[in-house]
Amino acid sequence: LKELSKVCSRSASNLGVSKPDRPKWKKDVVVITGGSTGIGRDVVQHLSRKFGARIAVLDITEPTYAPAKYGAPDILYVRTDVTNKDEVAVAHSKIKDHFGNSPSIVVSCAGVALAGPILTTSSRTFSRTFDINALANVILAHEFLPYMVENNHGHFMVVASSASYFSLPLLGPYSMSKSAALAFYETLRAELRSVYKAHRVRTSVVTPTKVRTLLGHALKDSDNNFLTPVLEPIQVASAMVDTLDSGLGRAISQPMFTSLLPYVRALPEWFRGLLTTVGNTDSSVTAESIANSFKAGYGKNWNKDDFANVFGEMESMVRAFAKKKKKNRN
């Protein structure tokens, strides 16, 4: 029964075409957004070293990479705000000029974790988070998907989060935007099947828990390292690269137990409340953990004018936390 379920899921995830359509790494071009740091950086290095892949990185931060293996193509970096359709179009033009053809693989890895309580977090912060974590997927699809559909070949991979399924206090902007990213993936897969009839264009979604990146600092480490360990970027990146190379789409859940998270929404409210209590999820994000992420360097390369209100909100929250902590000590 388990094997039958696995076969059926594989067929559904690949629009009824279960035969692998593996990339031709010497021909296909890979676009990776957010490829300068974190998970994206490890995906870039892994693809370059293992397959000598032709890669373009779209990011606002210039990358620094260890040398790829001898003979691997240079990694093209194009400074790009992925929420700006004109900049993405310019990047596409540069990619075609550099490699000679359009990308057939897109890894949408750019993301931000902006946090704060709903009542004191500005609509601008919510909007900017949605722009980067959700709307950017639409802009990337508009720019790169037509080539994939035309050739009935390619792979569109979206990095969402376990927060897509399970929301946490103070993480509203992030959780909501990642839920939207998950919905984008599901809609894209459905339209490739029913609207565009591009059954060999693969789609994948990645939903990890906390990863040891600057972004991940905003979330406290779990008390249970067995059930919810802190993931290393290379763990997630390796699973992503293996999926791309397989020529099949799938949902990548890490650690393994997170594959059960979609079922949480079907549980009675009292049981979901019990999970919250047992897992102590209400204290997963605090003003202190958010402050620690910025102290570690998170956000240092952001456009300060664009995110001015965000920094102001974060500073206010951290000051309030410090004041409360001092009061408790006294």
Region roles according to the model:
Residues P117-I118, S122-S127:
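Substrate-binding pocket helix/loop in short-chain dehydrogenase/reductase
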Residues S161:
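Residue(s) in the substrate-gating loop at a strand-loop-helix junction
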Residues E191-T258:
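SDR active-site lid
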Residues G71-D86:
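Rossmann-fold cofactor-recognition segment
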Residues G16-A56:
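Canonical Rossmann dinucleotide-binding motif of NAD(H)/NADP(H)-dependent dehydrogenases/reductases
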Residues A141, S177:
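Active-site helix of classical SDR
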Residues S108-A115:
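Conserved NAD(P)H cofactor-binding loop of Rossmann-fold oxidoreductase domains
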